[in-house]
Amino acid sequence: MKITRSRCLILSFVLVCGLVPEVTADVEEATDGLSTTQEPIWLTDVPATVELIAAAEVAVIGFFQDLEIPIVSVFRSMARQFQDVSFGISNHSEVLTHYNVTSNSICLFRLVDDQQLHLNAEDIENLDAAKLSRFIHVNNLHWVTEYSPMIAAGLFNTMVQTHLLLMMKKTSPEYEESMRRYREAAKLFQGQILFVLVDSGKRENGKVMSYFKLKESQLPALAIYESVDDKWDTLPIAEVTVEKVRGFCEGFLKGLLQRDHEAEGDSGKEEL
């Protein structure tokens, strides 16, 4: 199957740039809804730091030689903003040495693709709350990550090139059980496929469904694609099960496609 390269560019445009105003709205909404309870965990030794990182899908650690610099208070505020991220902070030499820290730095540890993303001293020097919030938003990828334009930017910035989308309404009675199974399936493809939820109940997500030529009547459905290639496929499903998701993913990775998109032509391609 061959789809033109322009279609890959259209996909990235639809996912990342199609709803730019909402990116700002996401940050503002999260900032407005800060919790006053969560604080970073003070890490005084290596075992505690290792344990925190290992137990979290996403962990952000502030390694600071100087706790008086302005970014420290900004960092602490992030822990109140991102409730699904584990935050730690340390200025202990043993911890800094273990992680090869030679200057103030912030590191995001991510389980789903076993990645470590660093903001070094030079980055931190010009960092403010908005920039740090965006860094965490973009890279906050979990076993299952809910789609947003900002998250899409992170998806296209990862080493994992195959992404699976589950398109269904979060208000569906089957949502909770479907997500449990979807998450279970995601763990089978760590480092191979990133799993994403697209809430089809949001009108603004209609462009994502249109790109994959899916109608409301076909949902829930799976859509899978490679971010740097021309391969993609879809599978409407009446019920989300681990077996169905695993079979669809394994088939795609082996080059087995459910639909012949070449035969469909480019009639469904959107020029945005």
UniProtKB/Swiss-Prot annotation:
Principal localisation: endoplasmic reticulum
Q: Which CDD domains match?
A: PDI_b'_family (cd02982), PDI_b_family (cd02981)
List every stretch annotated PDIA3-binding site.
230-233
Please provide, in alphabetical order, the Gene Ontology terms of the cellular component aspect for this entry: endoplasmic reticulum lumen
Entry superkingdom:
Eukaryota
- Where is the protein localized? Endoplasmic reticulum lumen
Sequence motif: Prevents secretion from ER, positions:
269-272
Q: Give the record's glycosylation annotations as residue positions.
A: 91, 100
SUPFAM superfamilies, A to Z? Thioredoxin-like
Span of domain Thioredoxin: 39-152
Q: Name one GO biological process term.
A: response to unfolded protein
Question: InterPro entries attached here?
Answer: Thioredoxin-like_sf
Signal peptide (from-to):
1-25
Q: What's in the keyword line of the UniProt record?
A: Endoplasmic reticulum, Glycoprotein, Signal, Unfolded protein response
Please name the Pfam families in this protein's record: Thioredoxin_6 (PF13848)
UniProt family annotation: Belongs to the protein disulfide isomerase family.
Listed under subunit, the entry gives: Interacts with PDIA3.
* Role: Specifically binds unfolded proteins and may recruit protein disulfide isomerase PDIA3 to unfolded substrates. Binds protein substrates via a hydrophobic pocket in the C-terminal domain. May play a role in the unfolded stress response.
Question: Which protein are we looking at?
Answer: Endoplasmic reticulum resident protein 27
Which lineage do the record's taxonomy fields give for this organism? Eukaryota, Metazoa, Chordata, Craniata, Vertebrata
